[in-house]
Amino acid sequence: MNTSDFDFNLPEALIAQTPLKKRDSSKLLVVDHQKKTMKDTHFDHIIDELNSGDALVMNDTRVLPARLHGEKTVTHGHVELLLLKNIQGDQWEVLAKPAKRLKVGSHISFGDGRLKAIIKEELDHGGRIVEFSYEGIFLEVLESLGEMPLPPYIHEKLEDRDRYQTVYAKENGSAAAPTAGLHFTEELLSKIEAKGVKLVYLTLHVGLGTFRPVSVDNVEEHQMHSEFYSLSPEAAQTLKDVKANGGRIVAVGTTSIRTLETIGNKFAGQIEADSGWTNIFIKPGYQFKIVDAFSTNFHLPKSTLVMLVSAFAGRDFILDAYKHAVDKHYRFFSFGDAMFVK
């Protein structure tokens, strides 16, 4: 299986640079991979695709303002750090620029010196382990000094930070938003719940691997980065009950899918409370164990996310759906439109 098998033509004008004024006014392409049908609608009609007794599973991770601009304390050279994941205490794995000038022992200062960092370890591809020092609460310092880590294909300034968070974001820890969830409003979720759909939350902290292009020709050789996930006992029990009563598990986004399928693989197709690190790579040939349907945004050509969607619905059909989306001027990527796959 070659990476080029998942390529498609995408005009740059279709890459959404800003979110729509109303979250749920985005377009929704409903695709049925068994009937091979496609239907154009709007996101607030996703409620029509959900049945009483289903579970809608969402990732409640919250994006950190994880991009920090500072300077080396000796040379005053500009430094940019992107927080990837918390290792322990005040130690973080970061992506550093310019990495070659940041050796072990280098000191960095941010803002007015309220936040400082020292390089503890050098990793591959510009990665570093840093230890922060500060007064007060780290997340509060980060909120005041950090910027939202928007994807590299978004060039417009984000006017409202909250638009790169889901309305149900709660657990701090992501370097990127679980973008399929950006379309939901509190009002729409209330209507969905009133229909008899169970709203269930899990956590997966999205790492930067989500934007990293596949750099190998052979799909099998691609290595996924590990991300932390968690499913609570209460959430697991709700999902078990839904399955037992014949309801569907409907995942919101690829991060929810990857969490649920990680758990399904670990517990022989069953749903159990669990937490840990996952680097699951779902590609054609994979047999889904938990997820029955899902919503997701439109992804980059040749990305692992297109491969995941193709694993569920078939590569040829998904590429047909993407061609339809391009022809109909759907908006792509993080601030773009969505598809519902069943």
Curated annotation (Swiss-Prot):
Pfam families in alphabetical order:
Queuosine_synth
Q: What is its main location?
A: cytoplasm
Q: Where in the cell is it found?
A: Cytoplasm
Q: Which UniProt keywords apply?
A: Cytoplasm, Queuosine biosynthesis, S-adenosyl-L-methionine, Transferase
Q: Which GO terms are recorded in the biological process aspect for this UniProt protein?
A: queuosine biosynthetic process; tRNA wobble guanine modification
HAMAP family, alphabetized: QueA
The record describes the protein's role as: Transfers and isomerizes the ribose moiety from AdoMet to the 7-aminomethyl group of 7-deazaguanine (preQ1-tRNA) to give epoxyqueuosine (oQ-tRNA).
Q: Which family does it belong to?
A: Belongs to the QueA family.
Q: What is this protein called?
A: S-adenosylmethionine:tRNA ribosyltransferase-isomerase
Q: Which organism is it from?
A: Streptococcus mutans serotype c (strain ATCC 700610 / UA159)
Which classification does the entry list for the species? Bacteria, Bacillati, Bacillota, Bacilli, Lactobacillales
